[in-house]
Amino acid sequence: MKILFHFTITLFVLSLVACNQIKSPEPVKQYAFIGGKEGDKIDTTCFDSLQLSDPFILADEETQMYYLVGSGGSLWKSTNLKMWTGPYQYITVDTTSWIGTAPRIWAPELHKYKDKYYCFVTFTNPKIIVDTVPNRYNVQRRATHILTSDKVAGPYHPISDKNYLPEGWSTLDGSFWEEDGVPYMVFCHEWMQTVNGIINYIQLAPDLSESMGTSTTLFRASDAPWPREMKSIGELTFGMAQEGYVADGPFLFRTGTGRLGMLWSSWNNNRCAQGVAYSKSDKLAGPWVQCNTPLISNNSGHGMLFRTFDGKLLMCLHHQSLDSENPGPRKPTLFEVDISGDEIKILEKYHP
């Protein structure tokens, strides 16, 4: 009888241990396309008719095709820069993650790196508040994530679930840069949270799946002499006059003399403007010296550079009318530029 009793107790204990060792099932990931408009009619239109903020063009040698992306999450493609086919959906995410089912999609970049394609893109979930700054909007969850695909047109999906930057930071406009074989992300710590917008960088893992260490500040928006404080020029952000300096859209390049430069944007008397800074050390770590005046003004900015298949170097950026009553949408525009010397120079507007 004692043996049976001890045997029963032993079985009971073992069953408890087994139960404790059984892990709760992990939530099932649900991947879906986001951005763009599902069901949009695929059509062909001329470049001058496109409406897009934060445009970025990848000239893909393998397919001999140009791929245009921008805020909103749609992709367009072209063989000649003049006529574009789209819009296509190309971004997929786990909708059970913090990104959610309907995030805002800002400033994507497409890059080919080590035989794979990557999309650096900023997501915002307005339902998640990460910080509160007095006299400003609540700070929403906003962060750049890195997606990957075997094909340039996608679909792109997150490399991992890891956060590249602190959850409590509002970060955006992540841009890819490689220096001495090491990959980095250059990004903005948003002025809506910091008041004075900051451009930072952080090292990435070799496969871009995570960040390494902590980020480093390169400069602040007010370090340049040309940006204007937003409230002082009567600029409204989401309908509210807020003090601060904008830092936006970093993009790095190297001149013909090996000088390291950075395109970045802020606001001046003519609203959005395209600025330039140069690294004194010609290394990402800087220090960075700001040009005294914008490269392009008149409500244009968030520029990037790419080379056409026939060798022209072009800058693509968005432009919007200065008409205060009816400015219309932002539209991508192109300029031919020269970086063969020590600095970037605008040659002329480029018409495909």
Predicted regions and their residues:
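Carbohydrate-active catalytic/glycan-binding domains of CAZyme proteins
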Residues: C19-P352
